[in-house]
Amino acid sequence: MATFVDRVTVHLRAGNGGNGCVSVRREKFKPLAGPDGGNGGNGGDIVLVADPQVTTLLGYHRRPHRSSGNGGFGMGDHRSGHTGEDLELPVPVGTVVKSSEGAELADLTEPGMRIVAAPGGIGGLGNAALSNPKRKAPGFALLGTPGWEGDILLELKTVADIALVGYPSAGKSSLIAALSAAKPKIADYPFTTLHPNLGVVQVGDVRYTVADVPGLIEGASEGRGLGFEFLRHVERCSALLHVLDCATLEPGRDPLSDLDVILAELAAYPVPEGQLPLLERPQLIALNKIDVPDARELADFLRPDLEARGYRVFEISTVSHEGLRPLSFALAELVERARKEQAVLDETRPRIIVRPKTVDDSGFVVKVEGGSEGPVYRVLGAKPERWVAQTDFQNDEAIGYLAARLAKLGVEDQLVRVGAVAGSTVVIGRENGVVFDWEPTLTSAAELISSPRGTDARIGVNARPTRAQRREDYFDRMDAKAEARAELLREREAGLWKDDDAAVQGGSEETGRE
């Protein structure tokens, strides 16, 4: 069973915002106490936190679906709904957060760094919050918006100062075990190391981290062996240490050819934009296993050739610890130099300037798209899309409120500017946007999703009569019935017609008397 996972796709569902409440205060001797509907609670966020105690993404590989709490609905008596509980997900330091399309969202390189990966929905306002001098008792409330839902990609890139690279069984794991207190798996067969191992080395006042990555072979960039995808763990390293095996018995292999193969594979690895290519970083060479017979002679023979290439060479043995002390001090020197250079870069790095929105920023755009039945005008913007999501399209007053907000924002004026005419198809939102047929004589014309295309529930008159109207209608019907009965009585008395039932009944009585 896998114990180390460095790349995983996680499906997140943030909490939905609670709906606002429609309520009117009912109290004795106060018939006009006013609205008292509370607001809905906000949905919980899903937050990623860089935790130094976490070293793998295995937990998210086993449970890829995570969700936070929903916000509570508003209630009467000005009681707001509860806020949904946030969900904090600990991830290893060095985790890169990417969208499902591959765009980098955040790089959690320091312990304690946080990012809201999935924001929760916004709670809807109750009718108490929507009341004003002109709308004293709103008969509607705003709905809560849904929380963000989708997939993100978590990719772990080990944060280390020095990376050990080399062929399988070159002694990289033994070296990191000799330099630090790390205890990686060590065996005498290739590909013993299947995932990166980290070790902390203390040299004088300098402390640095060494990463042991799985071995590289020729063709790793084409997928041979374990491939070279794990080289993402080398991207953050400031220097490389090539560990060459001077005691290999495999035919066709020698330390120089091994080095050429490793350099070719490192050159084929694409580093992210803005980072220094792997081969342009400081590199040292460690000729390992000089304790083996004939290995020391081979190391002495190869050393001049490697130094002629510009490398600084160390002859070491992880068994006898020979040469490890000067190697550790040389690595510390590289780390100190890289840290000073990084400090200078951080000081000269351009600062991110957040500028406020311009005065004439409307907060939305109108795009004209082609359609089979003519142009489609799509309104995109945070405010219009959120307002549509918060509107209860089963409530006429809520639709009117949406129309007023869109008109005040300037949506109708912008539609006129881009060429929309009466009957044009307008969509607010993206894929699941609300479609309506635009009528410029109205403030807006939001179409009910459940109603036929081109109709608008706001245009219809509210057919529910008042109590006085029902009372007046009842008396009118009673008066009409009384007048009709009186008219029939007058016509019968005038002989214009006679009651057949009465005539039949009279004839039966005469027959009985005979």
Swiss-Prot record:
One biological process term in Gene Ontology: ribosome biogenesis
Keyword line: Cytoplasm, GTP-binding, Hydrolase, Magnesium, Metal-binding, Nucleotide-binding
EC number(s) reported in the record: 3.6.5.-
Source organism, top-level taxon: Bacteria
Binding residues annotated for Mg(2+), in chain numbering: S173, T193
Domain OCT: 356-440
Binding-site list for GTP: 166-173, 191-195, 212-215, 288-291, 317-319
InterPro entries named in the record: G_OBG, GTP-bd, GTP-bd_Obg/CgtA, GTP-bd_prot_GTP1/OBG_C_sf, GTP1-OBG_CS, GTP1_OBG_dom, GTP1_OBG_dom_sf, OBG_GTPase
Subcellular location: Cytoplasm
Molecular function as annotated in GO: GTP binding; GTPase activity; magnesium ion binding
Coiled coil: none
Domain OBG-type G: 160-336
Cited Pfam families: DUF1967, GTP1_OBG, MMR_HSR1
Cofactor(s) the protein needs: Mg(2+)
Location of the region described as Disordered in the Swiss-Prot/TrEMBL record: 62-88
Function noted in UniProt: An essential GTPase which binds GTP, GDP and possibly (p)ppGpp with moderate affinity, with high nucleotide exchange rates and a fairly low GTP hydrolysis rate. Plays a role in control of the cell cycle, stress response, ribosome biogenesis and in those bacteria that undergo differentiation, in morphogenesis control.
Protein name: GTPase Obg
Organism, as annotated: Leifsonia xyli subsp. xyli (strain CTCB07)
Organism placement in taxonomy: Bacteria, Bacillati, Actinomycetota, Actinomycetes, Micrococcales
Gene that this sequence comes from: obg
